[in-house]
Amino acid sequence: MDSELNSLLEKTRSFSLDMLKLTYQESIPSELALPTAFWESYGDEKLAIGLRACLAIWATSGKKIVPNEFQLTATISLMSGQDTLVDVGTGYGKTLCMIIPCLLDSPGSISIVISPLKRLQAVQVLEFERYGITTVAINEDTPNDPELWKVWPLVDFFWQLSTLFCLENMYREVFGTSGST
């Protein structure tokens, strides 16, 4: 992510609710802004998460995209520590539900996405990178070459990594569990 965007995201992490409201009103065109009724059910903490999410996507998409209601509902739920299930069809924007928390989290945080298909991993990696998030897919096609891991010392590699995609069966091998709770 370029330093200007990173600086902007860092600033919004520290904005007060009043500053978030003002910035949202001044930045997001009224025709793209979510209806007032959507925001009314949220208390201050969750409202701040939602506004911050809108501003993060607006900035990283080149001022083109504002998350829709289901994406914000999912983000607010995730960022509030709740278990979250998003059940919408192909092409509706589930990937953005994974991208937004990465943008809102502190720099250096790591997200792990378990993805069942290598092609889906490839598409999602490209989408994450489009928003400036350093991403890598690790699956059975990743070389099992010790030299690869010497190039990226494990600790540094994971600190630089924002999102890691891996196949469900690799998750089971590494963690010895099905991944479900």
Name what the model sees in each region.
Residues M1-T181:
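N-terminal helicase ATP-binding lobe
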